[in-house]
Design a protein with these regions (language model features):
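Alpha-helix N-cap/helix-start motif
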Residues: 15-18, 52
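An amphipathic, aromatic/His-enriched active-site/gating alpha helix that lines ligand/cofactor pockets
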Residues: 17, 23-39, 58-94
């Protein structure tokens, strides 16, 4: 299994929109679903700060992830640009 983990800092005034867009039914998950190897997305919030989040995106294996990126890179970049106002920092952890 290939797991991608990202950490995000989110301003309080856009938390609801962030949770919609980055959650299991959001824009990223819908885009990833174009891959037959996509297994799901989970969203976690830091209960102490309420402004730090983790996303965990699961693919069948690294090959499925690489194939998705090769076939959907333009859409991937477009979603990133469209949603960048929802975060003040992001780190690709895994």
């Amino acid at each position: 299994m290939k797991v991608r983990v990202w950490r995000y800092d989110v301003p309080t005034d856009v938390r609801e929109e962030f949770e919609r867009e980055y959650g299991p039914e959001g824009s990223w998950a819908k885009l990833f679903a174009a891959s037959p190897g996509f297994l799901g997305t989970s969203l976690y919030v830091d209960v102490r700060s309420r402004t730090s989040y983790l996303t965990v995106d699961r693919f069948a294996d690294d090959e499925a992830w690489q194939l998705f990126r090769a076939e959907h890179d333009t859409a991937y970049q477009e979603v990133g640009v469209r949603l960048r106002h929802l975060t003040t920092a992001q780190d690709d952890l895994v």
